[in-house]
């Protein structure tokens, strides 16, 4: 993600009235001087994700953002999206929200394989926790 992002937390807890809110991933972008709320979804984009993100951004701006910082930004990452549906869902939103997709792969790229241990080594290390 680059050197301009600072990790703040995962499942970051906020309150809205008496309701608990949990943001999947909260980052801070140094150059933008903005909090970045990221929501990870396993399926296709749904309009209610935008409403929930607006709630998160409002709570962040009221409770966490410092006066000298810019408004918080939301990113919703889904497995798939219908571009027109996303545009309609975000059309009247005043909050900066983006929607992105991800792709799953069955194999790791070659350069990443070199960085990770073999599956047998991972299994061996995990057995330590079973004991």
Write out the residue ranges for each language-model feature.
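Charged, terminal alpha-helix-loop-beta segments
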Residues: 1-131
């Amino acid at each position: 993600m680059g050197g301009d992002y600072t990790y703040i937390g995962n499942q970051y807890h906020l309150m809205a009235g008496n309701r608990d809110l949990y943001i999947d991933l909260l980052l801070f972008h140094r150059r933008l001087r903005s909090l970045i709320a990221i929501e990870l979804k396993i399926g296709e984009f749904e309009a209610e994700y935008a409403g929930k993100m607006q709630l998160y951004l409002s709570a962040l701006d009221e409770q966490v953002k410092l006066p000298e910082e810019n408004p918080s930004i939301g990113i919703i990452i889904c497995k798939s999206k219908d571009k027109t549906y996303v545009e309609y869902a975000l059309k009247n939103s005043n909050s900066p929200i983006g929607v992105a997709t991800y792709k799953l792969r069955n194999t790791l790229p070659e350069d990443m394989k070199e960085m990770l241990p073999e599956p047998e080594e991972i299994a061996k290390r995990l057995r330590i926790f079973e004991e």
